[in-house]
């Protein structure tokens, strides 16, 4: 998919903000950063890679306001939680933007199944191909996705794949943080403003551990059950062979500090096929499976 010279210039302007921190500091307000994105979208037909989370929702909101035309594309796969797919459909209706859903078979990709340290690179590379092909078929000018400046901390091989493919990450390039995105969502009255971040289910497995359909479905069910039974918004079920490690949001840990609730947690994890169940007392933190790399 070819990018016009004018669009490329606009993209470079965004990159300059990222590459020169002193430029970003000179911006008077956060709104000036968002204005850069509005300028990028102006007069263009924009396809938003859409998950229904706060990042892609705010990006879609800006596209609807600023672009000549905007469409949403959700890629559905075994590693996309079932609850997230429905949420994406609901938020698309809230935004009033057309949503395309494309089904892909991630587990047919051996590089993803083997779960190497650079798994996210291979995953994003495949996703980028799907997005760009869809954009061409739909007659859109370019594809954008919601990686933000806060996401760039730590191990992020997926960002490299997106940049190589020519998928734009406007929030990252304008140095817009997660907090700034949430603040925008609140001002805009978007329902997802305080929605916890969600990563694909592949992130629940230690690098080098094979990712299978059965394992993914077990993890997905546990997380769904924990949310429903205990009213927890943020939960991760980390796979460690016969053992599953449960993380919940740090401010939500007390919701499970009860003997009967811990028994319920144990029972539902046993039913999912695990011999051992642990509750991570520190709670959820992003990139937990990358901690092994740091050690």
Language-model regions, residue ranges each:
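Polybasic, lysine-rich low-complexity intrinsically disordered segments
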Residues: 2, 15-22, 26
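Aromatic (phenylalanine/tyrosine) cluster motif
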Residues: 8-11
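ATP-dependent adenylation/nucleotidyltransferase module used to activate substrates
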Residues: 24-187, 244, 260, 264-274, ...
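Mid-to-C-terminal catalytic subdomains of enzymes
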Residues: 172-178, 182-227, 233-234
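A short linear hydrophobic-aromatic micro-motif
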Residues: 232-237, 276-278
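Short, aliphatic-rich beta-strand segments
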Residues: 239-250
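Short, conserved charged micro-motifs
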Residues: 253-261
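Short, low-order "capping/linker" segments at domain edges
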Residues: 287-295
């Amino acid at each position: 998919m070819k990018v016009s010279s004018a669009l490329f210039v606009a993209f470079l302007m965004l990159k300059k903000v990222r590459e020169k921190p002193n430029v970003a500091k000179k911006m008077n307000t956060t709104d000036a950063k968002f204005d850069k994105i509005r300028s990028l979208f102006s007069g263009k037909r924009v396809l938003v890679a859409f998950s229904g989370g706060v990042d892609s929702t705010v990006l879609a909101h800006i596209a609807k306001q600023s672009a000549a035309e905007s469409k949403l594309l959700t890629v559905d796969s075994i590693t996309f939680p079932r609850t997230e797919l429905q949420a994406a459909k609901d938020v698309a209706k809230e935004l009033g933007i057309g949503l395309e859903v494309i089904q892909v078979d991630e587990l047919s990709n051996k590089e993803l199944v083997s779960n190497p340290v650079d798994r996210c690179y291979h995953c994003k590379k495949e996703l980028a191909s799907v997005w760009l092909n869809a954009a061409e078929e739909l007659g859109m000018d370019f594809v954008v996705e919601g990686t933000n400046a806060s996401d760039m901390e730590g191990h992020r091989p997926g960002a490299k794949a997106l940049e190589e493919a020519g998928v734009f990450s406007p929030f990252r390039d304008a140095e817009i943080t997660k907090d700034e995105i949430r603040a925008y969502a609140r001002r805009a009255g978007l329902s997802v403003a305080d929605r916890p971040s969600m990563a694909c289910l592949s992130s629940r497995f230690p690098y080098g551990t094979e990712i299978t359909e059965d394992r993914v479905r077990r993890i997905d069910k546990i997380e769904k059950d924990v949310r429903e039974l205990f009213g927890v918004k943020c939960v991760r079920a980390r796979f460690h062979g016969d053992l599953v490690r449960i993380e919940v949001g740090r401010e939500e840990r007390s919701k499970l500090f009860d003997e009967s609730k811990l028994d319920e947690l144990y029972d539902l994890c046993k039913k999912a096929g695990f011999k051992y169940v642990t509750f991570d007392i520190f709670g959820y933190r992003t990139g937990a499976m990358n901690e092994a790399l740091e050690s």
